[in-house]
Amino acid sequence: MRTYLYKLTSDRGGAPCAPPPRAGGDPLLTLSICKPAIRRTAQPGDRILGVTSHGLAATDGYPLESVIYAAVVAEGIEPREYYAQRSRFRSRPDCIYAFHQANGTLTHTGRTRLHDDRAYEARDIGRYPFYRNARTLLCTDFRYLGAGAVAIPAQLTRLRQIVQSLGQGHRVFDEKSPEAKELDALFKILWKLPSRFTPKVVEDEAYGHTPNRK
């Protein structure tokens, strides 16, 4: 089991995406855009920890060094399933691309402003024909806290130091990492809390930048 740690620069419901479930449905958190390196490599049973960045604290008032969401990966699925025309995920706010069976291409659906600039495609889905970044992570066991982000306890000193020094990338920890015990303790604390949900409708994220075109 590995734990992925990264900082969110925006939290408007696109990534992570965890809208309220339909009546009788089960809660689901997905990561289908942003953080392609995590989406490419995370496996079932791995954990993801998203924490507040200085930018998000400044723009949205989120508390610093706090957990916005934590999740356990249940499955990673390919774009031909997540973005299929009749996909069971089609109504989700982050299902913003369409897979065309005839030629194997992916295009933005155009039904939302979320990442509708083609500059996002390389990071979101990658290049045709392989679309290496188009993998989506499904998480049925999660805690999304949003603006109610929970501060990492002061006694978890090693973890707090790592979060303070973390930049735009991400860190990966395995069960033998010195931080493993603190991570386990944090997840136990978080799992005692009720989960919130992201908006049903997502207009756009608020990164304050657009990826450079390549």
Tell where the protein language model's regions lie, with residue ranges:
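Contiguous surface segments at macromolecular interaction interfaces
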Residues: 1, 79-214
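Compositionally biased, charged N-terminal/linker segments
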Residues: 1-43, 195-214
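Short, charged beta-turn/beta-strand-edge "cap" motif at the junction between a beta-strand
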Residues: 52-62
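A general structural signal for short secondary-structure junctions and capping/turn motifs
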Residues: 38-41, 60-63, 128, 133-136
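Short edge-strand/loop segments of extracellular domains
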Residues: 72-78
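Eukaryotic short linear interaction motifs
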Residues: 13-14, 57-58, 78-81
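Loop/turn positions that initiate beta-strands
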Residues: 44-49
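Short coil-to-beta-strand transition motifs
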Residues: 61-72
